A protein has these predicted regions:
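Bacterial N-terminal signal peptides that target proteins for export
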Residues: 1-7, 308
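Conserved active-site regions of diverse hydrolases
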Residues: 20-308
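A short, hydrophobic C-terminal helix/tail in secreted or cell-surface proteins
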Residues: 306-326
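C-terminal membrane-anchoring or membrane-association module
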Residues: 321-340
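Low-complexity, intrinsically disordered segments with a bias for serine/threonine
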Residues: 7-8, 12, 312, 330, ...
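C-terminal segment of classical bacterial N-terminal signal peptides
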Residues: 15-20, 323-327
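Bacterial N-terminal signal peptides
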Residues: 8-17, 319
Length: 340
């Protein structure tokens, strides 16, 4: 009887904190833009908020919505943190999410602070050595890509001009991400996830500008991502989260992800504001919280061991065998010899 209870308790302890404890993460630190901002801009820009309904697909919010974020509810970082048994509260409120809406990956403008500035602030608060068993997620580049798209639009049909903007944007973006990764690793980080750039060409705001803008937006993101993949290379401390491909997969087969509309901004429709669960986009570029859940699930599958791996680890651990004997608990190898 006691051995059965012990086995049940052991199984519960082993599998209950499946994502957090077995993955070994003690904290989640996030650096990013509006896709990741869990409330920093809401604090910094209060009491300004973006009202709904919004005018249409072209609308991109400057201020957070009533949720305090650039979406209808939680961002992916909060959803992921909850699943891992951690938290991702805004850094301005003492939390571990340093993301600010509108942030570029680098640059000298402090408002909003770039990802490089966010990482520097984090290191000044937690350095010189940071937790090696924490999870660090670097999400950025979408703002860089959008600025490049606007700038390239001013080139007209001048391909040299367009290519120059794409190349300079890409070089700056990759350099910024490499700087952040290098600084985190030098301080002790061992678990870093870097997002690539989302396919801005398929967002409602860019689609509203026509097919040429859409194709150019996709091209810009693709070039940036190819360079990022090459730069990250075989660094064992860094995992690449392919948000570009995930977005394409969702749009290609929305039903498989529980969605029905992947082209329109939900927040322009009163009915959708009340129930946004079937829409991919909340406004012209920002996903709904339903889409953020898809993102969170994908990241979790990247950073948490597969169930099969966990099962093998469990079997190996149990192979040593814990048994509760009449005189107490002892470790054994092989078959039990005492009474249950």
């Amino acid at each position: 009887m006691k051995s059965s209870v012990l086995a049940s308790v052991f199984a519960f302890v082993l599998f209950a904190p499946l994502s957090g404890a077995l993955a070994g993460y003690t904290s989640l630190f996030v650096f990013g833009d509006s896709l990741s901002d869990s409330g920093n801009n809401a604090v910094a820009l209060a009491p300004n908020v973006t009202p709904v309904p919004i005018p249409g697909n072209s609308f991109i919010a400057t201020f957070p919505y009533m949720s305090g974020r650039y979406t209808n509810a939680q961002v992916w970082a909060q959803i992921l943190a909850s699943s891992l048994g951690l938290s991702a509260n805004p850094s301005l409120l003492g939390g571990t999410d340093y993301a600010f809406g509108g942030a570029l990956t680098g640059g000298s403008n402090p408002i909003p602070p770039s990802l490089e500035m966010q990482a520097a602030l984090f290191l000044s608060q937690h350095g010189p050595m940071i937790p090696s068993n924490a999870l660090y997620i670097v999400e950025g580049g979408g703002e860089n890509a959008q600025q490049a798209l606007v700038a390239a639009g001013g080139c007209g049909s001048n391909l040299a001009c367009i290519n120059g903007i794409i190349q300079s944007t890409t070089a700056g973006y990759v350099g910024d991400i490499q700087t952040i990764d290098t600084e985190l690793e030098a301080a002790g980080a061992k678990n870093i996830v870097v997002w690539n750039v989302p396919n801005i060409g398929v967002t409602p705001a860019v689609l509203a500008e026509g097919s040429a803008a859409s194709m150019l937006g996709t091209t810009i993101a693709s070039v940036m991502n190819n360079a990022l993949s090459t730069a990250i290379g075989m660094d064992s401390d860094i995992k690449l989260f392919d948000d570009f491909s995930l977005l394409n997969q969702v749009i290609a087969d929305p039903g498989a992800f529980g969605l029905s509309n992947v082209t329109d901004a939900c927040a322009q429709f009163t009915a959708c504001i009340e129930d946004p669960s079937k829409f991919l986009f909340w406004d012209g570029v920002h996903p709904t919280s339903a889409a953020k859940t898809i993102i969170s699930d994908a990241i979790e599958s990247l950073v948490v061991p597969e169930p099969s791996t966990l099962a093998l680890l469990t079997a190996a651990f149990l192979g040593f065998g814990f048994v509760l004997c009449s005189g107490g608990t002892r470790l054994y190898s092989g078959r039990p010899t005492g009474p249950e």
